[in-house]
Every structure is written in C-alpha cells, then in structure tokens.
Regions:
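N-terminal membrane topogenesis motif
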Residues: 1-32, 65, 70, 78-88, ...
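Interhelical loop/hinge segments that connect adjacent transmembrane helices in multipass membrane
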Residues: 2-9, 148, 191-232, 236, ...
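Membrane-proximal transmembrane or re-entrant/amphipathic helices at the cytosolic face
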Residues: 2-5, 414-428, 441-501
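Signature of the first transmembrane helix
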Residues: 9-66, 91-106, 122, 127, ...
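Transmembrane helical elements of multi-pass membrane transporters/channels
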Residues: 16-31, 178-181, 185, 189, ...
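Membrane-interface helix-loop junctions in multi-pass transport and translocation proteins
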Residues: 39-49, 54, 145-148, 159-191, ...
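Interfacial segments at transmembrane-helix termini and the short loops linking adjacent helices
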Residues: 105-124, 291, 308-338, 384-389, ...
C-alpha cells in the first residue's frame, strides 16, 4: 500500500538518489557559499551568534517533529487519519514551543555570554511555526520518492534566501543578514512544499491514530534527541565556556565538513530508507542495495573530505586572518565526515528493519560518552585561545564517533542486512585509496606554485590537481564510478556544446 500523498508512479531507487543528490548538493552548496560570503564580511563572532540561535531552534524542533517523519516514511499502512492527527499534534506543539522560545531567549543569551543573541533568537523563532507546516508534507514526498519536487523546492529557496542575505550583508545589516537569509529561505521553502504536495489536512483528530503513530515514533524520537546531544552539545559547551568567537571558528569548519556529508551522503541515505523498507523481506537484495549505497556514499564524501583537508589553510586565509584558526579544525572534521559517510547508511537500515530502539540506545550511549569528553576537554583548554579551544573540541567530537560508534553501528547493520565486513570494505576501498592521491597531488601543487601564484590561484590549481589524481584512482578501481564517467562522456558526445546561438 502506498498510502496517502504518494505519487501515482513511484520513482526507482536510482532516480530517487539522483534527485536527492540534486536537492542536497544545490541546497548545501548554495547555503555554504552564501555563509562564506557573509562570514568574510562579518567575522566569527556574528557567525557564532547565529549558530547558537540555530542550535536552540534545532533542539526545539526535535520536540516538534518527534520522530514522525521517519514513522510516516517507514509504515507499510498509512491512512488519512494518521496524517491528520500528526499534522494537528505538530501544529499545537509548535505554538507552545514558539511561546517558550520567546520566553527563554534572554536566558540563552546570558549563559552564552552573547548579549545580541536574545534579539536574534526572538526574530528567528517563527521558524518553529514554519517547520510545523512542513513535517507531514515533506515526509509524504520522501515516502513516495518524489525527490525531484523536493530538489526544486530546496534549491529555489536556498538561492532566493541566499541572494537576500548577501544583499543585506553588503548593505551593512551585520548579523541580521544571516537572520534574514534563514527566514526568507524557510518561507520560500514552505510555499513551494505546499504547492508541490498533493495532501491537505482534514479537520479531524483521532486519538487512536496518534497512539498508533507514536508507538514507533517514540523510539525514533529518543534516537534523534541522542543525535542532537552528540552533534550539538559541543557547540553549547563551547558557547557557555568560551563565547561566540570560538563557536564561530568551530561551527564554520563543521559547516564545511557537514556540507560535504549532507550534499553527497545524506541524499543516498534519504533515498535508502524507503528503499530498504521495501526490501525487508528480501535479504539478498537488501544486502546488495546496502553495499551499493555505502559505496556510493563513501565514494562521494571521502575524496571530497580529503580534498577539503588538503587545502584548508589556503581556503581560510582567503576568508581573512581572523578565520585562519579554523583550518586545523577542518582537517579533524574531514575524518568525521568520512566516518559519517558510512554510518549514514547504517542507521536507515536499522530503522527500515524495525530496529529504531537499537539506534536510540547506541546514539544515547555515544551522547553520554561525548558529554564526558566535552566537559573534560573544555576544562583543560580554557587558556588556549579560541583556535586552540575549537581544535580540542573537534578532536573530542571526532574520536569517539570514529573509534567507538561507527564500528558498532556498522556491525549491527551488517548483521541485519546479512552482509559482511569484507563486502563493505570492497565497497569503500576505491574511496580510501583515493585519499593519498588527493592529498599528495594538492600539496605538491601548492609547494611548486607557492612562489608564483596568490592564495586563490594556488587553491584553484591544488583542487584541480588533487581532484584529477583522486578521480583517476576512483575510476580505475570502481566499476560504478567508471560506468558513471562513461555515461557522462556519452551524454557530452551526444549533446556537444554549440558555439553561439
């Protein structure tokens, strides 16, 4: 049963991945480019202030969504009364969370030593109400693998919001340029989502439907709260302990690494959850799809993360001297991005096979470890200055995830998919072998050209040389990437560029 809101023709998994990639690549890259332009004009303190407001809103939105997105996607049987009940519960919850956010904004600014934060958070608080109107619609489009509509919506909103933010920054709006960019993006995304979505809520509420949905979503929600703790607690501790400048350096490096993951791995994971759910009763096909998904995710993320690490010093020098302390932080987060490229496929597999409770336990276990690590690290680096504080916290976040959490989730996913470590290693091997080629190629280009080019010129050449070296390794070792290159060349040959009109 497809359930309400599904499109008449379901897209294939491959087509869903393609449009999910278009959505996330465009959205993430546009958003990151906009932030980089604005950050170069404003500096780490303004960026850190908005980041702290965003962390607060992300926490609030956990209680808004309550794991219902995954529940709507995963359920085999879904009716209109389920959707109506979810919509009205979410909307009522949003109203209460909105009022609570307005009340707590002053306290949040005080504990983070950022006086401007209170006003920023209050102005950004309508995002809570906007998000409440998107949860069910977006889940239905994901459930039906309608990622083309989601891609158009996300990219259009990101471009319009980004343009407004950049114009405001050049006009001297300061920190409010970042705030305006986020608000405009959210409003445009909401309008387009309801334009594309076929479902509309009915004026009815079923308590039985709520109970039915929350039986599964509770475990998903607990897992998402744990994910928030492990992914956002570091920013909170940095803000409380060191202030917005350290937060700005830390979050900028994290944003770049996360952009790589969100743009190139998350689309595969988003398409994988409904695909894995449909293959619950076909172990052989589930194993094959799981390995293919891990290989695609790693093949996209790991080379890009290696490249970002290799040129991080050049990149941040271009933003300005006050950002140079973020270069070493990005190197550490490149390792985290590589680990997440594999882990991002383990979690949807466990959810699709009916094990959301397992992911919740694992996520909370890592969160508990992270709490201890962050508190200890923060107490040891108080006198090291913002760059040293940000770097130490980055190591404290990356090490437990890579050395503890990933091996456990991967082992469980392999068991549920009836796969093998060897199969996963074969899938990620081309990406791993591309890393030394990328790093050596990029740094060699920098060493040779340093006397002749400025930072921008060296950055462009280093990216080109490192990318070519890594691409050669991927194409040589991976049939999938070799086939992708062949298809791309065929498309170019069939549609050659024309000179003039």
């Amino acid at each position: 049963m497809t359930g309400p809101g599904a499109s008449p023709e379901h897209s294939s998994f491959g087509n869903a991945v393609k449009w999910s990639l278009v959505m996330n690549i465009g959205n993430q890259l546009t958003g990151t480019i906009v932030l980089l332009v604005i950050a170069a004009l404003l500096g780490p303190e303004a960026f850190g202030t908005v980041a702290l407001a965003t962390v607060f809103l992300l926490f609030v939105q956990l209680f808004l969504e309550q794991g219902l997105t995954t529940t709507i996607i995963q359920r085999k049987t879904l009716t209109d009364r389920h959707l109506d009940a979810a919509f009205w519960v979410i909307l009522a919850t949003a109203a209460m969370l909105f009022v609570g956010t307005l009340s707590l904004a002053g306290w949040w600014a005080e504990v983070n030593h950022a006086p401007n934060l209170a006003g920023v958070l209050r102005v950004m608080s309508p995002i809570i109400l906007i998000q409440a109107l998107t949860v069910v619609q977006q889940a239905l489009l994901q459930r039906s693998l309608s990622f083309k509509a989601l891609a158009i919506r996300a990219n259009t909103a990101s471009v319009i919001g980004g343009a407004v933010g950049i114009i405001a920054a050049f006009a001297g709006a300061g920190v409010w340029a970042l705030v305006l960019q986020q608000l405009v993006t959210q409003v445009i995304a909401l309008v387009l989502l309801w334009a594309f979505g076929m479902w509309r809520p009915g004026l009815r509420f079923s308590r039985a439907a709520v109970v039915d949905l929350y039986g599964f979503s509770r475990s998903v929600f607990l897992g998402k709260v744990g994910t928030f703790v492990q992914s956002q607690l570091d920013s909170i501790i940095i803000g409380v302990s060191f202030g917005p400048v350290a937060v700005g350096l830390y979050r900028m490096a994290l944003r770049i690494a996360r952009t790589i993951v969100d743009a190139f791995s998350q689309p595969v994971a988003m398409a994988a959850l409904p695909a894995f759910s449909r293959l619950q009763d076909d172990p052989a096909e589930l194993d094959r799809t799981f390995r293919d998904s891990v290989g695609r995710s790693a093949g996209l993320v790991i080379p890009l993360a290696a490249g970002a690490a290799a040129v991080s010093d050049l990149f941040f020098r271009l933003l300005g001297d006050e950002w140079s302390g973020a270069a070493a932080v990005l190197v550490v987060f490149a390792v985290l991005a590589a680990a997440r490229s594999v882990n991002n496929l383990c979690l949807p597999l466990l959810q699709a096979t009916g094990r959301p409770g397992v992911t919740a336990v694992l996520t909370w276990s890592l969160a508990a470890v992270n709490v201890g690590v962050f508190v200890v690290v923060a107490s040891l680096v108080g006198d090291r200055g913002a760059p040293g504080q940000a770097l130490a916290m980055a190591v404290g976040r990356t090490a437990p995830f890579t050395l503890i959490y990933l091996p456990i989730t991967l082992a469980l996913a392999i068991r549920m998919a009836e796969s093998s470590f060897r199969g996963i290693l074969v899938a990620v091997r081309p990406a791993l072998f591309s890393v030394p080629a990328i790093v050596v190629g990029a740094r060699a280009a920098v060493a040779v050209l340093d006397p002749y080019l400025d930072d921008l010129g060296m950055l462009l050449v280093a990216v080109a040389v490192g990318g070519l070296a890594g691409g050669c390794v991927l194409v040589t070792m991976s049939p999938f990437w070799r086939g992708a290159l062949t298809k791309a060349l065929l498309v170019i040959r069939r549609n050659p560029p024309t000179a003039g009109t």
